[in-house]
Amino acid sequence: MTNTSTPPHLNWRDSFQVKSFRYQWPADLATSWAFEMETILLGWYILSTSGSVLMLVVYGSLQYLGSLLSPVFGVVCDRMGYRRMLWSTRAIYALLAFGIMLLSYFEALTPERVLILAAIVGIIRPSDQMMRNALIARTLPAAQLMGALGISRMTSESARIAGALAGAGIVAVLGMTSAYAVVTLLYVISFWLSRGVDDVQPSPNATALASPLQDLKSAFTYVWHKPILMGAMAVAFLVNLLAFPFALGLLPYAAKNIFLTNQTGLGFLGASFAFGGLLASLTLSSHKFKLRASQTMIIASAAWFALDLVFAFTSNLYMGMLVLMLAGFVQSLCMTPLAAVMLRATDPAFHGRVMGMRMLAIWGLPIGLLASGPLVESIGYVATAWVYSALGLILTLAIALYWRNALWDKHSVANNAL
C-alpha cells in the first residue's frame, strides 16, 4: 500500500497565497460549523418531541434530497461561474435558519415544519461540497491542489467537532432560539466572506455546446467510460449507503437508546467521529506516509464497515467514543483519497460536472437511512449493523475485484502517492 515516489510541490501552506482561497476557507468553515450545529439541533429536537426513529431518519434523508440535482448545479456553475452560486445558496441558508429561529421564539416550531424546511435546504445543500471542491480545483494552481484539499478536509472535520459540541451545549444551556441565533450568524458570516471569492470564468466548452442538457449528457458519458471514476463512484455510493448512517442519522438513536445519554453525550459521540477524521487528515497532509491513493481508499472502506459492527456491540459511552474515533480515522482515509483519485483522473474542463456527478453518491445515505429505520424497529439496532456491515464488506471486495486494474494495480494513476 506504500509508494516510494514523492509528489512534488505539496505544501498545504501555499494555498493561502491565493486571495480567493483566503476568503473561501473561512467561509467554508463557518458554513460547516452551521451545518453540523443544525444537524445536531434538529435531529435531537425531532427525536425528543416525536419519539419516532422513523421521523428521525426521514429528517436525515431530506438533507440530501438535492443530491440528484448536483450534476445540474455543476453545469450551471461551469456556465455561470462559482462565486454567484456560492453566495446565493449561503444567503438562502441564512434566511431559512432565521425562519426556524423565529418559529422557535414564537413557540410555533413543530417536527412537521422542521421536515418541510429541511426539504427546502436539502435541495441545495448537497451541492455545497461540490462547489467547494470544484472552486478549489479551478482557482488554485495544480501543484497546490492536494494541499488545499487537505486543508479543506481538516476544516470540515474540525467543524464537525465544534458543531457537535457547541450545538449540543448551546441548546442545553440557552435553548433552541438562542442556539439558532448562533447558526444564523454563522451563515451570515459565510455569505459575507463568500462575496470575496474570485469569480471563475465559465468553462470554454460551455459556449461551444448547444445546451445545458448536452453538458449534462457529456458528464455522464465521460464518467461512464473512465473505470477509475466509475470505481471511485461505486465506493462513494457504498459507504454513503451502508457506513455513514451509523455515524450520522442513527447517532441520536444510539445516544438515546444504547448509551442512555443526553444531547451533551450525543455531541461528544459526534465529536469523536470528527476528531478521528481530523487526525487522519493531518496524517495525510503531512506527506510522511506515501500511500497509494486507491488502495488506501479500498482498505479504509473495509475497516470502516468492521468498526461500525464493533460500535453496534458497544454500550459504554467512552468505549463508543473510542470506536467512533477510529471509525472517523478510517473514514477520512477513505474519502480524502477518493476525492484525490477523482480529481486526478478528470480533465479540468469537466471538474464541475464530474464533482456534481460525485455528489450523486450521497443519495446512498438517504436510501440507507430510510431502510435502517424500519430495520431497527423490527430486528433491532445490532442486527441492522450486522446486515449493513456484512453487505459493506462483501461489496467492497466486489468493487476491488471488478475494477482491479483501475483501482488496485500499483501502476494505475489512481494509485499515485498521496
Residue ranges of predicted features:
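Helix-loop boundary and gating motifs at the non-cytosolic
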Residues: 7-65, 221, 225-271
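Residue-level signal for alpha-helical transmembrane segments in multi-pass membrane proteins
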Residues: 41, 45, 70, 99-103, ...
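Flexible cytoplasmic inter-helical loops of multi-pass small-molecule transporters
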Residues: 2-9, 195-221, 409-416
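Hydrophobic alpha-helical transmembrane segments
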Residues: 111-122, 147-203, 271, 275, ...
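C-terminal transmembrane bundle of multi-pass solute transporters/carriers
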Residues: 57-59, 72, 79, 83-95, ...
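Juxtamembrane transmembrane-helix termini
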Residues: 106, 110-113, 141, 199-203, ...
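Substrate-agnostic recognition of the 12-TM MFS/MFS-like secondary transporter fold
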Residues: 23-39, 62-75, 81-96, 113-172, ...
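Membrane-interface helix-capping segments at transmembrane helix termini in multi-pass transporters
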Residues: 47-57, 98-123, 143, 147, ...
